[in-house]
Amino acid sequence: MDLSGIFKYYCKECENTWNNSSVELFEDIETYSKDSQKKREKELDKFINTISVHLERYPSDAVLRKMWVKKGEVFLQKTLEKENIFKLEKMDVEDRKKFLDITKQFIRDARKFDDDLPIGDIMQAMRNVWISNALQLLFGKEIYYSKANFAYSMLYPYTDNYLDNTNIDKNDKILFNNWLEKRLLGEHIKSKDYHESKVSQMIDYIESVYPREKFTQVYESLLLIFKSQVNSLKQHGKENHLCKEDLLSISIEKGGSSVLVDGYLISGFMTKEEIESVSYTHLRAHETRHDL
C-alpha cells in the first residue's frame, strides 16, 4: 500500500470538504459564550499551575514522598472527573478508570524521562495520549498505554516545539532535521547532544514495540508527520506570505499526519478505511477548534 499517496489523497478530500462546507452552524450544536470559554480556560490554567507547583515540591524524604504522590493522584483524579473540563461521564466506568490511570502514569513517566521538562510541555504531550485513547475506542479496541504511545506523544515537545521556537538558529534546525530524518529512516546515527539523545531514545521505544522489519508503515507515517512539521515552517517569518489555500493544505497535512501515527500505533497496521476515518476525524476536530 502506497501510504504517502493514500494520505495525500485523503488530505485533498479533506480540503474539498472544508471548502464546500457551510459556514452556518447546525441548530443542535453545543456553543459556548466568550465568558464561558474564559472561565474554562481559567480552570484549565489553574489545573496546570497546581500540578506544576505540586511537581516542584517533590520531597527528598521517602515517607513524605509517598504522601506527596498520594495527594497528587487524588487531586488529579478529582480534577479529571469534573464534567465541565473533560466530560468523562460519556465513558463507561471501566474506560474512565483506565483513562485516569493512564493519565497519572504518563505524568509519572514523563517526569522520570526528563525532570526538567516544563509542565506545559507535559500537558501538550498528554493531549496526544488522550487522542490515542479516543482512537482506540473509535476502532473498537480496549484503552491501553504503551511505550510507543508515550514516546510518540513526548516527541511533540522535542521536535515540533523545537522547530517552532523562533529563538533557535535556522541552521541548527536544518542540522537537526537532517539528523532526525536519517534516524526515522532507521540509520544508526549518533546523537551529538542531549536533545538528540532524548529524541533517539523515544524512537528506540517505538522500535521496541513495533520492529521496523514487520511494521514498515508505522515508520512511513512517522516520516509523514516529520515532513509535515518541516513544511509547516513556511508559516513562520515575516517574509513568508502564504495564501489561504496553502495555509489550509499545510494545516490539514500536519494535523492529519499526526493522528495518522496515533492510528498506526494502536496495532501497527491500518486498513484504507481506517486511514480515511482517521483523516476525517482530524478534520472534524479541526473544524471544532476553528484553527483557521
Task: List the model feature ranges, each with a label.
Residues 138-139, 165-169, 209-216, 240-241, ...:
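Inter-helical turn/loop segments and adjacent helix faces that build the functional surface
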Residues 136, 156, 160-185:
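Aspartate-rich (DDxxD/NDxxD/DxxxD) Mg2+/diphosphate-binding motifs
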Residues 281-288:
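Conserved small/polar residues in nucleotide/adenosyl-binding loops
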Residues 173-204, 243-251:
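Divalent-cation-assisted or electrostatically stabilized phosphate/pyrophosphate-binding catalytic cores
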Residues 71-91:
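Low-complexity, highly charged intrinsically disordered N-terminal segments
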Residues 1-32:
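Intrinsically disordered, low-structural-confidence terminal and linker regions
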Residues 47, 51-53, 58, 74, ...:
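Alpha-helical phosphate/pyrophosphate-handling elements in metalloenzyme active cores
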Residues 231-246:
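Acidic/His metal-coordination segments adjacent to aromatic residues that form catalytic metal sites
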